[in-house]
A protein has these predicted regions:
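Aromatic-lined carbohydrate-recognition surfaces of secreted/lumenal glycan-active proteins
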Residues: 20-29, 97-100, 120-158, 171-173, ...
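Substrate-binding cleft of secreted/luminal carbohydrate-active enzymes
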Residues: 167-212
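Glycine-rich tight-turn/loop motif centered on a GG-T
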Residues: 110-124
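Substrate-binding cleft of carbohydrate-active enzyme catalytic domains
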Residues: 9-27, 85
Length: 212
């Protein structure tokens, strides 16, 4: 379903209720933008023997539901996502929660078709993208990395490196059962970042946030 209200109109209504307007964006797991031919360079490109073939990479066979993803190494991807942040920021949103700043789950066969640096999931490209998004936001809009606490604790959130990030805020999503261990980890692994822990209240209905 597609609505007709603009981002500015939505943010205005939220603010008029005395609330903060937060936007939530899934970034690199975007299957639409790079599916348009003119935007193919925003997605992963097939490479053989160091030469781009002109074909696009999909996370499975295209005729069986495979989808393209945005490549954080692409200048077109960075510009596209920066423009989204700029629009939300200028529309009056207090914060943008950015999720899915990650690589796809590459399989061994992909090693033959992707640049070695991409197949190795170089975290620097993700961190550079996060910093570019932070730079695109106005001073009135916070960029918040919306991450899986479990993945962050186990090295799966490659973008999460407080020593290299210009982003000041992160939100770690977890369950109430893991909240204690995540809390202990977050308190000593946040660097200069302000980290919040978000989890359901046990019934699956509530939403609790603890800030560090």
């Amino acid at each position: 379903m597609q609505g007709s209200m603009t981002a500015s109109e939505i943010a205005k209504i939220v603010r008029e209720e005395g609330l903060y307007a937060y936007a939530s964006c899934s970034l690199l797991e975007d299957h639409l933008y790079s599916s348009v031919y003119s935007n193919w360079n925003a997605g992963y490109r097939v490479e053989k023997n160091g030469v781009l073939t002109g074909d696009q990479w999909y996370d499975y066979f295209p005729d069986q539901g495979g989808q393209p993803w945005l490549d954080p190494n692409s200048d077109l991807t960075v510009a596209y996502l920066q423009n989204i942040i700029k629009e939300l920021s200028s529309s009056g949103f207090s914060a943008v929660l950015c999720s899915d700043i990650k690589y796809p789950n590459f399989v061994q066969a992909d090693e033959k078709y992707l640049n070695p640096d991409i197949y190795a999931k170089n975290p620097d490209a993700l961190i550079k993208l996060a910093n570019a998004l932070n730079a695109a936001a106005s001073d009135a809009t916070d960029i918040v990395l919306d991450l899986s606490a479990y993945n962050a604790m186990n090295g799966g959130e490659l973008v999460y490196d407080p020593s290299k990030l210009d982003v000041s805020y992160a939100l770690l999503e977890t369950s109430s059962g893991d909240a204690s261990s995540v809390s202990s980890w977050a308190s000593s692994n946040s660097g200069d970042m302000s980290v919040s822990l978000s989890y359901t209240d046990g019934s699956g209905n509530g939403h609790c946030v603890i800030n560090y």
